[in-house]
């Protein structure tokens, strides 16, 4: 909301107030929150629905902080920050180098080549992910823009779902998901209900992931797979390398524009 709403909007004000008082949301009634935000209870309810919850109660239930909020076994603080604080950063840097080397040795350029070729033929392209994978999708948008290719990405979970649901056969979807969970679970709500939006879309789907099982998903056209050789989650670095190779291949396969000399 803070990235998409104007700073003068009511929803921006509500979002900022809730974030500044995040620790009390799970203990507060809708009346308490409405008073805190100086808006009506109905406005709070509308705000909750606008960000993907059925009502304020569901928002409240999902607000309890937990590092494993998205049900991943390896998380940023426990997997990266705590070991750095305990043992220094040498092991972490060594892990990044090892995983990059493993990708260099094991990477399959066929899938990267195919995605690059698809980027030259598909005009409607969306790239999505969650957390650090979402950051990768945004980076990919910028990197492709430097090559003259403009794609769509959204941080809003609802806008992502809307784009995927409305995608047709002329749409290319690129999904960044280290674990592959983004394809199977709706991770906004606390009970992570099953996500079937990808099963119903008509788009061609490429997935960039470390999970080999994604190859077996019937709705996935192709997978760009990268290995993990260490205990650290280094996918945010591997993503950057994969994206740079894709952009390079895209430029290679892009036919130069022809100039008509007809009068």
What is the predicted function of each stretch?
Residues 14-18:
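Basic helix-turn-helix/winged-helix DNA-binding cores
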Residues 70, 165, 262-263:
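Short, mixed-charge aromatic SLiMs
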Residues 254-263:
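Internal, active-site/partner-interface "lid" segment
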Residues 111-122:
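Glycine-rich phosphate/diphosphate-binding loops that line cofactor/substrate pockets in enzymes
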Residues 1-5:
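N-terminal intrinsically disordered/low-complexity leader segments
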Residues 120-242, 247-255:
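Glycine-rich phosphate-binding loops that contact phosphosugars or nucleotide phosphates
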Residues 6-10, 20-27, 35-38, 43-111:
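HTH-adjacent hinge/linker in prokaryotic transcriptional regulators
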